[in-house]
């Protein structure tokens, strides 16, 4: 399986593909797809005992300000397997900083055609529950707590327009850097 050939989406910035590295409720293991080979590697075992609150992955052919592909979080009714590609629509962005600098995470819902009635009315970040936002914030504020010299801080939740801008900026950055 070569994930390098997966496009960023059908129609950027509002119809995108998420490549899932870590399913919802996964154990505290950080997986990352090696961008050169497309192979899923164990990045590290996270010492903080926490579960991922939603599917975690990235948007291919993007580079965020931290030098990695743009992160994406996809809440779904069930965990999505490692290495799966899921068509999504962005609904917002979680802005953070960590020991490496600015870190944005796109929040996206599965494309309407995939939902068969689940959550099909969620179009913007304010449409997801406060509980879901709190769970995501709590996870990302604390998952590095037991790792030396690592830290995170949630700055803000922003709307779908900010998410679309972040996606286009990251896509254009990748094209400009030609990497």
Swiss-Prot record:
InterPro entries: Pyrophosphatase, Pyrophosphatase_sf
Binding site for Mg(2+) 1: 66, 71, 103
Cofactor: Mg(2+)
Predominant localisation class: cytoplasm
Catalytic activity field: diphosphate + H2O = 2 phosphate + H(+)
GO cellular component, one term: cytoplasm
Bridged cysteine pairs (disulfide): none
Subcellular location: Cytoplasm
Annotated PROSITE patterns: PPASE (PS00387)
Keywords for this protein: Cytoplasm, Hydrolase, Magnesium, Metal-binding
EC number: 3.6.1.1
Binding site for substrate: 30, 44, 56, 143
Residues passing through the membrane, by range: none
GO biological process assignments: phosphate-containing compound metabolic process
Entry binding sites for Mg(2+) 2: 71
KW Ribonucleoprotein (keyword) present: no
GO molecular function, one term: inorganic diphosphate phosphatase activity
HAMAP family with a match to the protein in the record: Inorganic_PPase (MF_00209)
Subunit structure: Homohexamer.
Family: Belongs to the PPase family.
NCBIfam families, per database record: PRK01250.1
Function description: Catalyzes the hydrolysis of inorganic pyrophosphate (PPi) forming two phosphate ions.
Protein name per the record: Inorganic pyrophosphatase
Lineage of the species this protein comes from: Bacteria, Pseudomonadati, Pseudomonadota, Gammaproteobacteria, Enterobacterales
Annotated gene: ppa
């Amino acid at each position: 399986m070569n994930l390098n050939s997966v496009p960023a989406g059908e129609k950027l910035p509002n119809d995108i593909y998420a490549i899932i590295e870590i399913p919802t409720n996964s154990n505290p293991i950080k997986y990352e797809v090696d961008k050169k080979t497309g192979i899923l590697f164990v990045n590290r075992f996270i010492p903080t005992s926490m579960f991922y609150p939603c599917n975690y992955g990235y948007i291919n052919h993007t580079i965020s300000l931290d030098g990695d592909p743009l992160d994406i979080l996809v809440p779904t009714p069930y965990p999505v397997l490692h290495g799966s590609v899921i068509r999504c629509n962005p609904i917002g962005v979680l802005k953070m900083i960590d020991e490496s600098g600015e870190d944005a995470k796109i929040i996206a819902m599965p494309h309407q055609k995939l939902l068969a009635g689940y959550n099909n009315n969620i179009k913007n970040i304010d449409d997801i529950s406060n509980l879901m936002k709190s769970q995501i914030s709590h996870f990302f504020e604390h998952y590095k707590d037991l790792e030396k010299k690592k830290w995170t801080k949630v700055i803000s939740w922003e709307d779908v327009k900010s998410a679309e801008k972040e996606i286009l900026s990251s896509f254009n950055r990748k094209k400009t850097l030609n990497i």
